[in-house]
Amino acid sequence: IAPTILELAGVEPDGMLPISGRSIVNILRSEKNGIVDETRKYVFMGRERHSSSRWENLGYPQRAIRSREHLFIWNIKPERWPAGAPQAINNETGKVYPMYGIDEKGIHHSGWAFTDVDDAPSKSFLIENYKDPVIHPYFCMAYDKRPEFELYNVNDDPFCLHNLAGNANYVSVEKELKTALQNEMERSGDPRMIGPDKEIFETYIRYSPIRIFPKPDWEK
């Protein structure tokens, strides 16, 4: 995004910190359909902390690579909840909220659980009805933990519902994308790959309010 904005604004990045990304202005301005820039084989993505949604203000680190046919995701800390912890603690009273933020009347309170997802009627509906056999699969897709590696054929499975990671028929594809992702992480100096402090992103200060959560089992 940064190099694209700079090019559109006619600003040279002189004196700025190094930018690893490449501008996509040529793609945005193109009138072609399909693949516009044949020199681009992959798109790389990453995530760390989105909000205060886990114990000790931890994030949910992910790295991903997208080719024309496949999406490969590395969930670096699969023991964590991607949508935020399923229980929070009241900052004032120290009381632990009920599991999934559902009170004794069966009503979901959005600020009590899965706080990496904003308040919404759809959020509350899925959580309040998670025991319903029809609703449960959707609840899991939205809020459950994810495996360390995910691989999807985005042409055959555009909604990415069928994880092919570990599938014997996709060993070569998974290896290719995993290697390309790791090579890019090394090239760009990603701390999650090359260190020396692979957890440095966890130490960044958050200046907005911080929620409190129970200590997870994997830290006890």
Stretch-by-stretch model annotation:
Residues I1-L8:
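Active-site-proximal alpha-helical segments within enzyme catalytic domains
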Residues A9, L28, K32, L181, ...:
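Sec/Tat-exported extracytoplasmic proteins
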Residues T4, R63, N183:
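Surface-exposed charge patches
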Residues P13-E150:
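C-terminal cap/loop subdomain of S1 sulfatases and analogous C-terminal strand-loop tails that border
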Residues V117, I127-F149, V154-K220:
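Long, internal low-complexity/basic segments
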